[in-house]
Amino acid sequence: TYISHAIQYIRNHYADDLKVVDIANYVCIDRSYLYKLFEKTLQMSPRDFLIRFRISRGKELLTITERSVEEIAAACGYKDFRAFSKVFKKLIGMSPSKYRTEHREEVRKRLYAAEQNLDELMKDENLLHLKQK
């Protein structure tokens, strides 16, 4: 479908200087028709989808990398990190730096819990092997 092709194009090119007209051209439809399809299907414009996709990717990079906010903004298709920060704060409710700080701790807790679960599984696995001998 046009929407799935458009979304795939966005996923592959979100870091580029991407415009809605580029997406429409890729899927071979008129820009206004692309807007109608997105509004009908996703209840948002293609531009809003692109912005939300970029910010979502930014959240991921803030959490799993040590890259600076400036580098992450550029990796998400923003030429100006201040514009990225402004949009990020508007959508997420906090600055990228604050998001990183708060969510890094959350990730650390999840990793610790996963390691504990793995340790328990390994103990269970060792017991299972001992019982089989």
Located regions from the model:
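An amphipathic alpha-helical interaction segment
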Residues: 1-8, 33
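Terminal helix-turn-helix DNA-binding modules in bacterial transcription factors
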Residues: 8, 12, 17, 21, ...
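Short coil turns linking two alpha-helices in DNA-binding domains
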Residues: 30-31, 79-80
